[in-house]
Regions:
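Short, low-complexity, glycine-enriched hydrophobic/amphipathic alpha-helices that associate
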Residues: 445-483
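The conserved Walker
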Residues: 26-30, 273, 302
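P-loop NTPase motor domains
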Residues: 42-52, 59-283, 353-354, 415
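Conserved lysine of the Walker
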Residues: 34
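Pre-Walker A (Motif I) flank of P-loop NTPase domains
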Residues: 11, 19-24, 215-219
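N-terminal pre-Walker A segment at the start of P-loop NTPase domains
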Residues: 1-12
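Conserved ATP-driven motor cores of ASCE-family P-loop NTPases powering translocation/secretion/packaging/pilus
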Residues: 40-42, 65-85, 283-367
Length: 483
């Protein structure tokens, strides 16, 4: 199979598998069919032996593990489009969950996340980000592994306690800035983030597997809870992309991708993001395709994505856009101009007329050139539309081989344990010093203590007796006075 069927008008609208790593865009207003389009693409890639990663935000993508139950609406769509090869079926699915509730746990270490993404997660300012950079440098220089949040908290405490010493070597470190980061870490931890950081850390190759019959495994990140923390959601997905870019070897253009990565609600990645962060996203998207990874952004409005990212998305599916405001009109104009024009279509006008499940589609051809834009209906998915059945969900969870691999957290010796030993030793030394000081103080106090009356009388008598004895001795030696 060299192409996948994604839509139909008079003809089948296909996507070239060899061009699937040139990335893509699924855009459109709420309720226009983006989620179903995502599901259809995931199904088609899986059929072709391409593993898929996607996030299930609304709870309606994990149902790809269930076959479609035909209804009148689906049957009518199949008839209208003259689709004869449709077969309701389920697809091989693995469920994952950062919080370890609805899927196998997904973890990363603090070191893997790195200072830039961590600063984004904690929403640090420039000064605080600089302190975090220094923390990672100190960690590297001193062999302090940063695996989980308590490792980072311990290192920050060490930096605050010895700020002047570290400042002389690494640059200015203020206790106030360190304290601000510590407070943000506590807040972050209270949101459940401690579940994400630690070991065993995710091996990305576990996302890149095929079933025994050669179909790509569809990895579904259960994200309905994660999505309530949008910065964590978007930064986590970017971390995954970054790790794929850093770990996978260069392969160039393949017959089909090694993995297709769907980034739903992609606008969150760029919302309030600093320029350096956006630049990193652009770089990762540009370069990860040579690692055999295709990235497909899903968002309501194409203008929510930077032009530098949009320009790299070769396969485009545009559902209806509404133009109620000047910004909406700008989006319609922008979307229409990105397509290779079809003389039979007024793209700017059609975008507002598209029905649910209908889209404007342009994919790259064999030469890597955009095809002329076509108006077509997305094929009905072969898996269930809606929320996954609880019994089937439990079966999928039970059968996930990575539940055992990642189910139990590991807490090996790292920065926290090493620094705790140092803190404990310092406390012992402080206690010994305090005891010695107290003992010395007690001895001196005893010497200065006023004598009692009895002690004074005894001392006087002894002194008098001593003087008398002394005189007797002297007389015995030198002779007494003559009378």
């Amino acid at each position: 199979m060299t192409t996948v069927n994604i839509a139909k008008n008079i003809n089948d609208i296909t996507l070239q598998l060899q061009m699937a790593n040139r990335h893509g865009l699924i855009a459109g207003a709420t309720g226009t069919g983006k989620t179903v389009t995502l599901k259809v693409l995931a199904e088609q890639f899986s059929k072709s032996g391409v593993p898929v990663f996607l996030a299930d935000i609304k709870g309606d993508l994990a149902s790809i593990a269930e076959p479609m139950t035909l209804n009148e609406k689906i049957e009518q769509r199949l008839k209208d489009l003259n689709i004869t090869d449709y077969q309701p079926r389920s697809y091989p699915v693995r469920l994952w969950d950062i919080f370890g509730v609805d899927g196998a746990p997904v973890r990363a270490t603090i070191s893997e996340m790195g200072p830039m993404l961590l600063a984004r997660l904690l929403e640090l300012n420039d000064t605080q980000s600089g302190i975090l950079d220094i923390a990672f440098k100190i960690s590297d220089d001193n062999g302090l592994l940063l695996l989980d949040l308590k490792d980072l908290q311990s290192l920050l405490k060490e930096m605050a306690d010895n700020a002047s010493e570290y400042s002389s070597k690494y640059g200015n470190i203020t206790k106030q800035s360190v304290g601000a980061i510590q407070r943000k870490l506590l807040s972050f931890e209270s949101q459940g983030a401690e579940n994400f950081f630690g070991e065993p850390a995710l091996s990305l190759t576990d996302f890149m597997e095929v079933s025994p019959d050669g179909e790509g495994i569809i990895n579904v990140l259960m994200a309905n809870n994660l999505f309530t923390k949008p910065v964590l959601y978007s930064t986590f997905l970017l971390w995954l992309l970054t790790e794929l870019f850093e770990e996978l070897p260069e392969v160039g253009d393949l017959d089909k991708p090694k993995l297709v990565f769907f980034f739903d609600e992609a606008h969150l990645l760029f919302k309030d993001a600093p320029t350096s962060f956006v630049t990193q996203v652009e770089q990762v998207v540009r370069l990860v395709r040579s690692k055999g990874v295709g990235v497909y952004f899903i968002t309501q409005n194409p203008i929510d994505l930077p032009d530098e990212v949009l320009g790299q998305l070769g396969n485009r599916i545009q559902h209806a856009l509404r133009s109620f405001t000047p910004r909406d009109q700008k989006a319609v104009k922008s979307a229409s101009e990105t397509f290779r024009q079809n003389p039979e279509l007024d793209v700017a006008a059609v975008i507002g007329e598209l029905k649910t499940g209908e889209a404007l589609i342009s994919c790259l051809n064999e030469e890597g050139q955009p095809s002329i834009v076509e108006r077509a209906f997305i094929r009905p998915p072969e898996s269930k539309i809606g929320v996954i059945d609880s019994t089937i969900k439990q079966t999928v969870l039970t059968e996930n081989p990575y539940q055992a691999k990642y189910g139990t957290a590991i807490d090996r010796e790292s920065a926290y344990e090493l620094l705790q030993k140092k803190f404990t030793q310092l406390e012992v030394e402080k206690e010994k010093a305090a005891e010695a000081k107290l003992q010395d103080k007690t001895v001196k106090a005893e010497k200065r203590k006023p004598k009692s009356e009895l002690q004074k009388v005894a001392t006087s008598v002894l002194t008098s007796v001593g003087r008398q004895i002394g005189r007797e001795i002297v007389r015995n030696i030198f002779g007494g006075r003559k009378r």
